[in-house]
Amino acid sequence: MKFLHALISVCLATACAEEKHARSPENPLDHLSQNIEVLTHFGERADISPDNQRVAFMAKSFGDAMLIDLNSRVITCLTCNVPAAAFLRVMHLVTGDYILIGPNHFEDIDTSRTRDDELWFLSKQRGAKPIKLGQKISESAAISKKSLKIAFSQLSAQAPELAPGTSRLVVADLDLSAGTPNIVNKKTVYASKDRSCVLEAQDFYDNDRKLIFTCYEEQGPQKGASVMGIDITTGEVTNFSKAPGTYNEAEGIFPDGLYTTVEADRQCEQLGGERGYGNIDIWMLRLDGTGKDFTRLTGFNDYEGGKASNPVISTDGRFMTFQVGRTGDPPGVGFGILLYRFKK
């Protein structure tokens, strides 16, 4: 009888554990914590202005760049004067102007997002139109919050002189002094020889002396990603996440340079599900080089088909913006921008 009681107790405990860790069928937006609020019910890839008063974001992939005032909550369109705008990202410069990323025109999802992805300058002046910078890039760019320094990665699709499978990180400056914006002082600071590490620039830190980037590990059965950092002066590279076989994509960095946000699949250890860029949530990683200090910030992947992604930190470190998405959609696709206030 004691054995039976013990067995029943174990079974009940197991059932409770399974129930606790099962993903909920409900909507995560119906269960937001008090420090999270919805800014928009559409849009993706948000970026916070240097003065923390506005948030730029994309209405959709291959669409228009938008701007929301955090005080009035009024939303305006930055590129609606561009016919058939097909941009993928909008990012603030320290001057208050913008960098746009995207193709000249939409051809197809793969070609327009890879071969034709390029940088544009958009003045903050009302009615301004985007100006091509003549620079093809892969995915996103790192934009300094202190200067006009930028960084980006390239693959052979954007730089035909690169061998297939290789990639490189380039640091440069944006020159606005001559009237026509121009990219100068381009320097390759790191290169990868194969697809075991496909590079993407993310954020500057330590007064622009260092750069956070992601190493996408695309060889082998598991598609992982690691949070990396490079000292631009010495070339020293550090793997901050140290978790091979798992997905850890670097996102917005905190202003003190001690922590960065990460899109990670670490919760799959408890929740199950396929690992990789689909089942992700937002985590915070201490940049101490141990890879052990991870803190989960959002719980959207606790819900069936839910994920949170693309976090960006305000320059005062008091809040971040991020987007809600669906696990089955391509990376970067979002359905609303949210604001997350860090608890004091």
PLM segments and residue spans:
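Positively charged n-region of N-terminal signal peptides that target proteins for export
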Residues: M1-L4
